[in-house]
Amino acid sequence: MAEHAVAEEADREARAQIERAMAYGIEPTHLDVHNSALWGTPALFQVYLELGRDYKLPILISSDGIAKVTPEYQSMLSEDDIVLDRVIMMARDTPVENWVPEYEKLFASVEPGVTQLIIHFGFDDAELRAMAVDRPNPNAAWRQSDFDFFTSAEFKSLVAKNDIQLISWREIRKLLRD
C-alpha cells in the first residue's frame, strides 16, 4: 500500500474518518492503523503522528516497534508523544490446543511498563467464516479462540498471577489531555 499512497490524500481521508466518527458522537480513544498502514514511509508516519497530535489522541506506537523500522522514525517523535514500551500478541501459527499455555508464557514475559496485547475477538460463525475464507490467522476460528480465552476465568487468573494492571486507551488519552 505504501508505495502507492500519497501522504496528503492519506491525511485527508484519515481526518475525514475521525471527523465523521466524532460527528456521530463517537469519542475516539486512540488511533491505530490496520497492519501498520501509516508506517510504510516517513511521510505516512508523519501523517500518523500529526493526526495523534492534532486530535490529542494517543497512537499505537511502541519502543520495540519503532526500533524495527528506521532511525528516522525515532527522530520524528517529540517528547510529548506517548510511546508504549512494547506490543505483543499470540503467534499466528499457535494451534488452538496450545492457546492457554502459550498465553501463560506470553503473560509471564510481560515486563514493567506499558504493553499492548493485540487480540482478535470474533465469533466462528457463517458471517465471519465467509469474510475470512482462505485467510490465514487470525481467521474465524482464531477469533473465536481469542474470545473464549479472554472471557474465561483462566484469563482473569493469569492477570492476577502475573500482577498485570489492565488499563485502557481512555486512560492513556487522558495523559495527553490533562
Where would I find each of the regions flagged by the language model?
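Structural motif corresponding to alpha-helix initiation and N-cap regions
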Residues: 100-104, 152
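Catalytic grooves of carbohydrate-active enzymes
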Residues: 24, 104-135, 139-142
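Catalytic domains of cell-wall/extracellular-matrix polysaccharide-remodeling enzymes
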Residues: 7, 15-82, 87-99, 108, ...
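Conserved, mostly hydrophobic/aromatic
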Residues: 31, 117, 159
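C-terminal domain-boundary segment and adjacent tail
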Residues: 59-62, 135-178
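Active-site mouth loops of central-metabolism enzymes
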Residues: 1-11
